[in-house]
Curated annotation (Swiss-Prot):
The gene is uxaB. It catalyses: D-altronate + NAD(+) = keto-D-tagaturonate + NADH + H(+). GO terms for cellular component: cytosol. NCBIfam families: PRK03643.1. This is Altronate oxidoreductase. Belongs to the mannitol dehydrogenase family. UxaB subfamily. It comes from Klebsiella pneumoniae (strain 342).
Amino acid sequence: MKTLNRRDFPGAQYPDRIIQFGEGNFLRAFVDWQIDLLNEHTDLNAGIVVVRPIATDFPPSLSTQDGLYTTIIRGLNEQGEAVSDARLIRSVNREISAYADFDAFLRLAHNPEMRFVFSNTTEAGISYHAGDRFDDAPPVSYPAKLTRLLFERYQHFAGAADKGWVIIPCELIDYNGEALQALVLRYAAEWQLPQAFIRWLTSANTFCSTLVDRIVTGYPRDEVAALEAQTGYKDAFLDTAEHFYLFVIQGPASLAAELRLDKLPLNVRIVDDIKPYKERKVAILNGAHTALVPVAFLAGIDTVGEAMNDAEICAFVEKAIYDEIIPVLDLPRDELESFASAVTGRFRNPYIKHQLLSIALNGMTKYRTRILPQLLAGQQKSGQLPPRLTFALAALIAFYRGEREGERYPVQDDAEWLARYQTLWARHRDRQMSTRELVTAVLSVEAHWEQDLSQIPGLVEQVTADLDAILSRGMRDAVQPLC
């Protein structure tokens, strides 16, 4: 069986117009997959040069397959049918290492056709590295590398206003474009680069903040033989992802036409502010996950998919989303409901086995950031505590007992919470502490909740009643009235 390469598998090729920092699975099944669709169906005509931003030879370079690789997109489509779609991605031209070939890296700035910069250098990538110098070949941090590359372009084109770039980071941090621009400006000032360059940075270049959403499951190790038998070639860079994707870019309206989104309506939104979209994702997608985990796990279920195929647990989650989360969010209801419907479809994806215990990691912080704002907003709006979001808090406290049907399971959180729960549950077991006292002890940790939740009218009472029901009757019986 042949390995992918352009000689044996000839096809479309596109001129270099995009620089991409990062060669990982996510960008390849998200950004590059979208660019490939735009290249095929519009006149975008933009090839990608991947820059490996760190000094490592693993995994091997995409250039070993001439930039070619296959994405397998699978999950439930909008009609709820299971679909699996293989696509040979032809839009990546080559990969270069900023470390092994620094000159080739700088030469990317000399190409007049270069227009876009995408990146995913992990959450830690957009950060300041004190030791980075202008003369380093290359500097360590991604923002310093980008500053050096932008200065190379500025010099090569003598500060031409039409040679700036549209810079679209995909790292999972808030307002990633603004954070990246601030660091680029910091390096420019520290390196004492000319004021004219700093003016060009802000006037000729556009830094966009983004929200990215797609579960990318990467190289399908267990299925490679079967998948390669279907495609008819060997592919060391096979990349799998779910059917759903959403790309929200905070940038000028003109970007839609420049990316040819007017000619192929992908699920890409060019918006003035990503904040409501971020809040929607955190509240609905992440919030539903966090509410689901302790309830489903203590009901004897191990994966998200199984939970969504369980009529009662599914009803609990859907009612939490539609009756308690959506009413307090700040976007049109129909838009929120369509997003929620996509979310529950994603949870049912038969191709992804999402273990509840792995999502349970750091559950206390997740509850505070993902669910608590909606619980408090709901209580303020109606004067009533949202029953399912409150029950999810009781379920979370029960989860930290670390025991299901008499069997222990690992609980992962910061050491302080683990120690606190160990003490509280031991005292409760020895009847030195009532359920109400245990609940009060958890809700009054101001350093965590950023307020004393035990002072919220009725919250201690309701969480105590729910927790007592879970402990005395079991999760199935306790959750039933809320399904």
